[in-house]
């Protein structure tokens, strides 16, 4: 990589850093973003190595190439029981940015991705249904941007194959019973009016 020879194994150059060098070699791209998801789910035994990586951009003696930045993401503990709370030493090595769901921003992405029009028109009317997480005595009830996107994909596929899109299907992706029921009713009306006006 970069004119130098390295052996890549779990005991030498990190697979993560090796992947960056491979991208550079394969594409000629010399700068970019190295994205690490679920950073706060790293096991306690890997925490020291992760701290070193975040602060110095190195694993052992191998450094992330110049021109590459590290971006990480993690979910809050209320969304994932595997999360380990960062201590002050960890927080001191990162720039924290809390991201909140915003339908108007997501809608631009969703439109570009070809999101099912029933979902977009429904959420235009019911913005509160876009993102919701509730803990009740009956368990967790939630709906997320990922759930809507996954639902859109299965709806498009189901319609193409003439398979039913019903409450049973919708509830697998929209895991809030009230919102799932409301959307199922809306979808039935959406289909009816779509058929009437074609």
How does the language model describe each region?
Residues 1-128:
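AAA+ P-loop NTPase catalytic core and its hallmark functional loops
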Residues 60-61, 80-92, 139-164, 188-192:
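Short, Lys/Arg-enriched charge-dense amphipathic segments
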Residues 107-174:
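Conserved AAA+ ATPase small/helical "lid" subdomain
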Residues 166, 170-192:
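Non-catalytic, alpha-helical, charged scaffold/linker segments
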Residues 195:
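Short, functionally important secondary-structure microenvironments
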